[in-house]
Amino acid sequence: MNRFRKMVTVVTALFAMQAAMAQDDVQITFDKLPAKAQSFVKTHFPKEEVASVWKDIEIEMLRVEDYTVALSNGTKVEFLPNGEWKEIKSRGSEIPASIIPSGIRDYVKKHYASSTIKDIKKKRYGYEVELTGDIDLEFNSKGKFLRVDD
């Protein structure tokens, strides 16, 4: 009987631990973001209020994968664990020009003057940019145009 109780206790503990670890998105406060990410938000979105901040934890590795900051205007900014931004998604408002590399800004202004950048994502090769009108463009790390992504 004693052995049965131990087995039940162990199984119950394992289920409880698994349930606790299954939550991989944890809401945190703004001050828990890496300092570099806090500075980025304050610099480029000074008039926007922070609606929520989330930390995404990789369950298997027990490490932080990224942070997501949702702003009052609907914009979401994803950061790497070191505080570098990796993606910015705008919902109705324009992404601040101060964030976008000048080569990308100039190319979009010249070739897609009536469009605005609604998403920008850092990739290994450079940047992926989505314009209003669902046009996807790719640029190298220096902001030089590579191709239209179909």
Question: Where in the sequence are the language-model features?
Answer:
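Bacterial Sec-dependent N-terminal signal peptides
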Residues: 1-25, 41
